[in-house]
A protein has these predicted regions:
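Core catalytic lobe of class I
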Residues: 1-261, 298-306
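Short, flexible loop/turn segments with low-complexity composition
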Residues: 155-158, 273-284
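Conserved SAM/SAH-binding loop
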Residues: 18-23, 280-286
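Short alpha-helix boundary/capping motifs
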Residues: 57, 245-246, 269-271, 277, ...
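Intrinsic low-complexity, glycine/proline- and repeat-rich
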Residues: 283-306
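A contiguous, mid-protein "functional segment" used to position or interact
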Residues: 253-275
Length: 306
């Protein structure tokens, strides 16, 4: 496997562990991880999850790993936890509330409690359609820091301004350009396409998130050669982002078939062949193309509706 190691050592560039994340966590020294990024299995009925998973299982999973997550994280380090919703009997349960309660309550008495810095909305254009409620098109990323001080490199993640030529219309800077020449703050709403069938990053994993998400977090919240941890590695997306951004990575995946996908992707990253969609604004459709034009039967249905 070359650069990829199966057992953790702080000198490793890439550690990919096939097994329970608790075993990996036990092998990592205290106060050594700069950033934890993950998207845990969250009882939404996908093929790779236990069909008996429920909210109580989700809670216990987080309670069981929290102490070791906190232990390995550096003071001043960050945790970014990406979750969605659990739908049961048409009732939507926001899982980020559960994560917030567990993480803040369990660390409240510590010298450096976890502090929620941002509740980032990840919005995407495609997903399951619903006829009984508005179709879900967003999930959450909770960014916590261990204590008050933390890395935040805004210039590394600025995005293009919509109107870069905009000028101040009053005050002492009247007539001067009002924006930052490097771009604007990406805000806490991130419009990044999710990984569906035709996405360049698509693998056989059913709940793969795009490289652009961990890539943006890694750029903003760590420095080169920092250590990134993903306890629920899945297809290795966080590892790909870490390697591309010149950070060290350690991840665990309990299912062999997804572990093998992660290994393959990281091997491709090492030789420079991994497929990544660039973190760029979502393109507006070209209305001259057939797929973007309103089909005649749709137009007819709309007229009949009116």
């Amino acid at each position: 496997m070359g650069m990829i190691q199966r057992e953790f050592n702080e000198s490793n560039k890439l550690t990919l562990f096939n097994g329970d994340c608790l075993k990996l966590l036990k092998s990592i020294p205290s106060n050594s991880v700069d950033l934890i990024i993950t998207s845990p299995p969250y009882c939404i009925g996908k093929a790779y999850e236990d069909p008996h998973d429920d909210i109580e299982t989700f809670k216990k999973q987080h309670e069981d790993i929290f102490d070791d997550l906190y232990r390995v994280l550096k003071t001043g380090g960050s945790i970014c936890w990406q979750v969605g919703y659990h739908v049961s009997d048409r009732c939507v349960i926001p899982l980020d509330y559960i994560v917030y309660d567990i993480f803040t309550n369990k660390s409240a008495s510590f010298e450096n409690p976890l502090i929620l810095r941002n509740r980032i909305i990840w919005t995407f254009g495609h997903g399951l359609n619903s006829t009984k409620r508005f179709s879900g098109r967003h999930e959450m990323i909770l960014w916590f820091t261990k204590g008050e001080q933390s890395v935040f490199n805004l210039d590394a993640v600025r995005v293009p301004q919509k109107y870069p030529g905009k000028k101040s219309y009053k005050g002492p800077n009247k007539g001067n350009l009002s924006g930052n020449p490097l771009g604007k703050n990406p805000s806490d709403v991130w419009d990044i396409p999710n990984v569906k069938a035709m996405h360049v990053e698509k693998t056989d994993h059913p709940c793969q998130f795009p490289v652009a998400i961990p890539q943006r977090l890694i750029r903003a919240l760590t420095v080169p050669n920092g250590l990134i941890l993903d306890p629920f590695m899945g297809s290795g997306t966080t590892g790909v982002a870490a390697y591309v951004e010149n950070r060290r990575f350690a991840g665990a995946e309990i299912l062999k078939k997804y572990y093998d996908i992660a290994v393959e992707r990281l091997e491709e990253a090492v030789i420079g062949n991994v497929k990544i969609r660039e973190d760029k604004p979502v393109a507006e459709p070209n209305t001259n193309t057939a797929v973007a034009k309103l089909p005649g039967e749709f137009a007819k249905a709309r007229r009949e509706k009116v």
